[in-house]
Swiss-Prot record:
GO terms for molecular function: sterol binding. InterPro entries: Ig_E-set (IPR014756), ML_dom (IPR003172), NPC2-like (IPR039670). Glycans are attached at residues 17, 61, 87, 117, 140. The lineage of its organism: Eukaryota, Amoebozoa, Evosea, Eumycetozoa, Dictyostelia. Gene3D superfamilies: 2.60.40.770. PANTHER family: COUNTIN-3-RELATED (PTHR11306:SF60), NIEMANN PICK TYPE C2 PROTEIN NPC2-RELATED (PTHR11306). This is Putative phosphatidylglycerol/phosphatidylinositol transfer protein DDB_G0285639. Monomer. Belongs to the NPC2 family. SMART domains: ML. Keywords: Glycoprotein, Lipid transport, Signal, Transport. Residues 1-21 form the signal peptide.
Length: 153
């Protein structure tokens, strides 16, 4: 169950390409470059950081600089920097991925909008959660790269 929760938290952030530090109020950090295919215009995450038993709302608005018709999503998720909860590479346009990140293919230009709402179960263990998402297109160009980290209390 906790793996599914963490994957949902990380997956809804797949297209966040922002350069901010990671602290208790800023849980996302770009590990990409200005050449990435997706650029974020705005993001709203409430509450930040996520809270057990509470609804988490994420809204993302961004721009693709070119079409993306296929690719891969490599996702690594860890608990307390010790236990690997998830380490897989998935088809970016699979039904599972589309349910989380939106319909594939993605078209060039503004505006890509994605909204997700979910609740973290009150039974989720306290601790430090971290992850890395690297999205690439079918030519192995980076769509975006994201690090996520937060303490769940």
């Amino acid at each position: 169950m906790i793996i599914k929760i963490l994957l949902l938290i990380i997956s809804i952030s797949l297209f966040l390409n922002i350069s901010i530090g990671i602290d208790e109020n800023q849980i996302w950090k770009s590990c990409g470059t200005p050449q990435d295919i997706f650029h974020i215009n705005s993001i709203v995450v409430k509450p930040t950081p996520p809270v057990k038993g509470k609804l988490v709302k994420v809204n993302v608005n961004g721009t693709f600089i070119k079409d993306v018709v296929a690719g891969e999503a490599k996702i690594i998720a860890k608990y307390n920097n010790i236990m690997t909860l998830y380490n897989e590479t998935n088809d970016l346009c699979s039904p599972t991925a589309q349910a989380i990140i939106g319909n594939c293919p993605f078209k060039k230009g503004p505006t890509y909008l994605h909204s997700a709402n979910f609740t973290i179960p009150a039974s989720a263990p306290n601790g430090y959660y971290s992850g890395n998402i690297l999205l690439t297109d079918n030519f192995n160009n980076t769509i975006t790269c994201i690090n996520v980290a937060f303490n769940l209390q």
